[in-house]
């Protein structure tokens, strides 16, 4: 017997969202379907009963999967089934994870698996904006401990109006695209891209999103109450010893505070912190440590956190000795590698990015074949974070979710600065060689430098900065930190990344770990971030005042041509024969496509002569022969009555024996013309019915003195009953010996 419970959320614009539970996946700890129009997602959540031994973190795993059947498509590939997660699916997982994770109890360490599956879509509504709502609702109807609910919505500003959960079409016209995750009371997560907007405009988008989220959270609470899942399961995942906690604090805090205010570097500071806890543990036997080591590690982590936070709040001293608004020292080097088309090193403190740029042609475009997005990308950014960047001794595996997420943020920060008509496909590769905080922002800065070094005429240079927050008493006492370290990110209350030009914000990413963060604090953080990124932008402009005027010598050259749609087939040729011939003869690469009723041809090569050669051949194909013009030609075949001459690519005409010279020849052999010989010819006429070309060579030669026009050959042949000559050619044009010219 089904016990189906549902709640409907009115979006206020004629659209609604329905949350339903009790019908599908009933063996999961919690399961809901979320429906908006023809878009249907199923979210399930399952949690282990006990914590993993020795686990001191929240082992949450979020999976988001889109089925190709949702839109009535077959997957690509040999197996014709869904494969590994796409970048889009991974990014959606991260959006959901970042909003959920802070709201699980600190002492809850059982494995939790959240699965969100797209089962139906119409290509109009965006399902990623519903994934957070679905995941939270599944937790709400379960007995898993969770201090929610939360929800996520996308807000876009289109034509000056903020729209909640816009369609794909609306998003294409938006100058603000924000994904916001929040509880009824607090913002938890923000991510988005913008077209150089002001801080106040971004904050207004967050406010609009939060109002919509409050309605969705209320609906989840009502759903949970209707289901009767108000009582959460009991758990005991941590063993505590309050006397030991006090002992760790009493014996270690003063020394930890001294290290926190010493202003030392990352590794020296880490070793000093480690020495304190090792000396504390030395007072216990191995048997005692077997019981107490895990608790000591937990309690000492709290001591480190308290020491760092108190040093900042009470004395304004940061771990590396900087003031709250101070940016770490920056050094920059451009054109640092000879091989890439552009390169730059950006180092800020102990964070360093070596970024390169590769320029490509249309054939290098990335094909994106997602369930709801089939397109080609011309601007790519890849972010790599090897273990050695933090001094870790471990193997490097494939690209992880973190790398995809950080690369996506940098990509969104820079992509609107690439001119829409830029002919090159651009790939930016950031390799993080050192990391101690805000490596994604180093990627943005190094990306700007490398693009300009490559000669990419970006609209404006972009810089980025990561902001942090230390707060207490519900935000009544707080310190905003500019250009945070890795430890300040880990031990602080906020990680707020902002990128932009001198005129406005281009991208942002924010994760908040505490309750009670007011909009006033956000405003102050954004203003401080603006001052910081403008300082960094100034350093970029000092090191590289102008974009390189031209591409580097070894970069590919690209030219574009526009031709009439009717000529596309002529340029390609049967089976691609003509376009392949152009590429073989010129050494250039030629791509052609129809755009807006025109043929757009992209010609690329390593040097200008090969491009010019290809352009010349294409112009010859699309050129319209003009009567009276002289053309260089090549004899393609010799017949008894004359020669066929190709005078433009793909265009042949008949050079009759009578038009070879002013003197008369009895046979074509007497002319000494050979197949493959190059001669100049003049176009005398174009037959209006057949389009055949009549050529002459003799009109280009000087007429002999006393020349007498001979009697027309056709009349004599007609009297003699002859079956040869021009008359027979016109009548028997299909024969191999009397073929018609190509036009």
Curated annotation (Swiss-Prot):
It comes from Porphyromonas gingivalis (strain ATCC 33277 / DSM 20709 / CIP 103683 / JCM 12257 / NCTC 11834 / 2561). Its main location: cytoplasm. Mg(2+) binds at residues 489, 495. It catalyses: RNA(n+1) + phosphate = RNA(n) + a ribonucleoside 5'-diphosphate. Keywords: Cytoplasm, Magnesium, Metal-binding, Nucleotidyltransferase, RNA-binding, Transferase. Residues 704-743 are annotated as: Disordered. InterPro entries: ExoRNase_PH_dom1, ExoRNase_PH_dom2, ExoRNase_PH_dom2_sf, KH_dom, KH_dom_type_1, KH_dom_type_1_sf, NA-bd_OB-fold, PNPase. Disulfide bonds: none annotated. It is an enzyme of class 2 (transferase). One of its GO terms (cellular component) is cytosol. GO terms for molecular function: 3'-5'-RNA exonuclease activity; magnesium ion binding; polyribonucleotide nucleotidyltransferase activity; RNA binding. The gene is pnp. Residues 628-698 form the S1 motif domain. Its cofactor is Mg(2+). Involved in mRNA degradation. Catalyzes the phosphorolysis of single-stranded polyribonucleotides processively in the 3'- to 5'-direction. Its EC number is 2.7.7.8. GO terms for biological process: mRNA catabolic process; RNA processing. Residues 556-618 form the KH domain. The keyword Signal does not apply. It is found in: Cytoplasm. It comes from the Bacteria. Belongs to the polyribonucleotide nucleotidyltransferase family. This is Polyribonucleotide nucleotidyltransferase.
